[in-house]
């Protein structure tokens, strides 16, 4: 029997509620598929700041480095917005990514048949959407230096630097190639090479790396056009490869094709060592504690963790199938309610999914 150790970071807002559902689901899966899973819970985000004065305590980061995978719920709350930037819950995410060397963010966007009518776009536009956004995570304008404010002038200024080296682009391209080879072997690289030198390097490097794999079909698209095409004809995409800033924007745009951001998981990976698996949605403090949050994105993130992080593919498939069955039977959380479905609480839909496993 295999033994796994994961760190669970419940974080803020609805995090504890969806984490509780995830713990129950993982325990059920471990019994059914004959593996042991030790779940170590640590403070992270705003709740960690309240106790330790930092959103990412050293103890939490050290434990994350030692585990097989990290399952993260969500962080943040408007009450922390007045803190210095490095003390806000969201900065803890940057510290976690840096500590684990997580350079690749993988975000699947798939329309589940039972939810096709929840999208704000027409059914015929979204019904065949099944794409993955591969986003470079620790480079680009979010991390580039120099950066800062100039306030001792008549007109205040602020500046950031978008910078990539070819090695950073090469390694994220290799991740995209690996994923594309498991799918339809199509990559669309998104940049702004008509005006940005950094995007010119991006395009050249991606081309050079993909040419080494004759199975891969590469196309290029400017980011403004990519945003338009994701709304006009999203099913044309299979694997979208892009930089940190562009990926941040496009992945959220793609998320809303599904009708609810509460349905989408993600994974942040490195070449070796534990990855972080987390839902796309935020902490939703306005509904925290009401037991009405949608836990499915968290559960699908757990499924990605099982498949990618722990190599328990059968358990991952079992969980996804259970989710689909519950949705097909017409059960929904409030964010997915369509008037004809039965609306369940966070814990109730979790119990339904457990029953289907």
Swiss-Prot record:
Recorded metabolic or biological pathway in which this protein acts? Amino-acid biosynthesis; L-leucine biosynthesis; L-leucine from 3-methyl-2-oxobutanoate: step 3/4
Any signal peptide, and if so, which residues?
none
Where does the entry annotate site (Important for catalysis)?
Answer: 142, 192
Question: Where is it chiefly localized?
Answer: cytoplasm
Under catalytic activity, the entry for this protein gives: (2R,3S)-3-isopropylmalate + NAD(+) = 4-methyl-2-oxopentanoate + CO2 + NADH
Acetylation keyword on record: no
Note how many cofactor molecules are bound and how: Binds 1 Mg(2+) or Mn(2+) ion per subunit.
One Pfam annotation reads Iso_dh
Q: Does the keyword Cytoplasm apply?
A: yes
Cofactor(s) listed in the protein's UniProt record: Mg(2+); Mn(2+)
Gene3D superfamilies reported for this sequence:
Isopropylmalate Dehydrogenase
Q: Which GO terms describe its biological process?
A: L-leucine biosynthetic process
How is this protein annotated for GO cellular component? cytosol
Recall the GO molecular function terms of this protein's record.
3-isopropylmalate dehydrogenase activity; magnesium ion binding; NAD binding
Tell me which EC number(s) this protein carries.
1.1.1.85
UniProt-listed PROSITE patterns: IDH_IMDH
Compartments, as annotated in UniProt: Cytoplasm
* UniProt similarity note: Belongs to the isocitrate and isopropylmalate dehydrogenases family. LeuB type 1 subfamily.
Function in brief? Catalyzes the oxidation of 3-carboxy-2-hydroxy-4-methylpentanoate (3-isopropylmalate) to 3-carboxy-4-methyl-2-oxopentanoate. The product decarboxylates to 4-methyl-2 oxopentanoate.
Give the protein's recorded name. 3-isopropylmalate dehydrogenase
